[in-house]
Amino acid sequence: LNKPIYIIFCFIGLIFWSCEEEQNRDCAGVIGGNAIEDNCGTCDADITNDCIQDCAGIWGGENICGCTDSTASNYDSNATFDDGSCDTTNIIITFSKNVSPENDCGYDIDIKQTNDGGYIIAGCNDGYAWLMKSDMYGDKEWEKMYELGDYWGNRTVIETSDGGYLFAGWQGALKTDQNGNEQWIQKGVQSNNNQYPYYEDVIEHSNGFFYLIGGPVTPRGATGQGGQAILVKINQAGTVKKTKFYGGNCEDDLFRAIIESNDGKLLMVGEKGHGNQSYPCSFNFRFYKDIYVVKTGLNGAIIWQNTYGGNYLEKGMDVVTTNDGGYMVLGQQCIHNYDIYSCGPKTKVLALKIDEEGNNLEETLLSGLYFFEAGTPMALSNTNQGGFVFSTVPKNGGSVWLYRWGGTVQTIDKKISPGGLGGESIEQTNDHGFILSTTGNTIIKTDSQLSY
């Protein structure tokens, strides 16, 4: 072969071989390799870790998508990029109002949101049970009094499945229609003459019955027992179907909150007395108690009952379900070391998480709770983002203490002075704000960030 022609052929072959080699190299320079460079500049053969676009369209970004408009009903305080989902069709309403009736006789009121977006308020007027219906702005639509004594103790109210209302207080319970017209009144404790139930809370169960709890009440014929916690089952017509008592032999056992359990039973929270050192029961019984939680069947048969606490003072005040199938109990604690006059600076908020069997999973303590011997008012609610919020009375810094924690939201710790002492009730409203009532007849409607 002619030498010049041979050289040309060799040159062409070298070019062809070099190009083929270049085409078969991957991003890592490996001939025949399968590494690929992703949109973030990372070169490897693992396609499972390729970067992706976040909601802001940034490759490898870490933006949290959601509504960043604090005036929207679905505002997300954790969102870093507004994804256009903000719902501003519902106007966020906030207010603080005193709703004292003309002849107010009891400064503790309860409030619940109603299906029409307004509120139902329970209180005391001239010594008797009193209901007030308001619109969404807290302005009165109607108010009525009933022949049920209510000048002492706490009271509670719920909207019932038929659109009416059920009021419960220290003397008994009453049911009304949607306009507040009385349908029935149930006074006293069945088979216990001259005793009242001192109701603290009520629910309408999914089975259609009302369950009311309170105390302390001494069961008929139980002269060796102190006042016990009480559970009463009432049907829609106002007939008492079951009355049950719970607790020990010491004074002042009572329930303060009841909910339908995760499995459709009943869960009740309150306080149970215990001894003082060598004494089986204490003369200063309000200072020697445990948190008392009882789970029962639908006729009150005990499934389990537990106490939580030590040698001194713990009280259970409210309870809600948790997203993982357990319960969050709100209470208070004073480790007074047998000096009952030292609780002023020592009393703390106690948040107790338990499972369906009552096992103690976690305890959280917060300092700064004001101390009342009969129990500092406290109320607890779930939030729509999986967390919790409580209202109570702070030792200083204001008259209402609002605290939100858990779930996917940032913790809020806020003290305010709206004109009442906080802690009677709190619940989330349909615009993701909160409605709460206080001692002093002040109601407060906040936004989702607890501002008003």
Indicate residue ranges for each PLM-predicted region:
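Primarily marks secretory-pathway-exposed extracellular/lumenal segments that are disulfide-
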Residues: L1-C105, D447-Y452
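A sequence-level/structural motif corresponding to short, flexible coil/turn segments enriched
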Residues: N90-Y452
